[in-house]
Amino acid sequence: MLRRNVLQLIGGGVVVAAGSVGGFIALNGPSEAAREPWKKAGQYGDFRRRALSYALLAPNPHNRQPWLVRLEGEEALTLYCDLARRLPATDPFDRQITIGCGAFLELLAKAAAQDGYQTIIKAFPEGETMETLDRRPVAHVVFKKGGTAPDPLFAQVLARRSNKEVYEPRDVPAQALTAIAQAGRAFAVSASTIGNTDLAARLRDLTWRAHLKEVTTPVTNQESVDLMRIGAAEVAANPDSIELEGPFFEAGRLVGAVNRKALADPSSAMFREGLAIYQNMAMSARSFGWLINDNRSRADQINAGRAYACLNLKATALGLGIHPWSQSLQEYAQMAGLFREAHDLIGAGRRIQMLFRIGYGPKIGPTPRRGLEAHLV
């Protein structure tokens, strides 16, 4: 109802004082400036900068892009976490942030291999705590010429997406699901995928209930709302986090329907519209996948991120969408019951690091990125 009303406002001239609806839509698309790093990837003279320009396109929680890099000498670098970009409400132990660092490192390694460099990665070289990340390095990377070959999956880096759309009502072939799982079985990570089975139906229900839990828990929902960038101007100013762009959001912003107060209020029309959108996404999932390891160290979380990057690229190569839906794996108190349910269902006595849906989604554009210079210290 809200979406229809906003579109009526556009067509009725409330938003568009002059010109056509088509003109309004054409002028209110996603921010191109916020996507510029995707076009600049690989356009650097130094091989490390070249590799980093691809690494910063990695999937990461809430698109926080928490990577800080210090270049060292001619053939090394150190990766740190930008602690201001943590997610203390939904990711209190920084597990998901660390997984995002692992995905960054895997794209770094694949990009360096294109230039003939092997990457020797040591996770947490100065020690770690499993409570929260701190100012100590996440990883130290040394590049060594030779001893590696280009990875065919690298060709998918610029096309890789997290496809957060409704998927088509058709099953994913078993052969494709097997190939995706095989791509994720790396770095001592177990990867599983399933088609449209009874277990998939249970996971649809579980992931939807976990989403509801997150958005109806005030502190976790507010964390997301505070990180929303509403409209192209906000996205261009802060090309990170959760972007709400396009004609619907621009029109809703102009008429006062889309704002942070409404997005944080479970009784608002905007909140209900958001629930409907996400429920449609959840119920469209016919296939799922998940990653498991022992989670005994931060290195296990890094490895989960590296494995996820591999299978995300494989899914892209197969023309499939993939969308992390891991709310039930989060460690805050209100999610404890669903956390146990998820692990009882598919955990096999170990730690589920990632849970995601797989399917045929529409073609979508890239998400905002901050650019290489924002990550260098």
Question: Model-predicted segments: where are they?
Answer:
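Acidic, surface-exposed loops and disordered segments
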Residues: 1-377
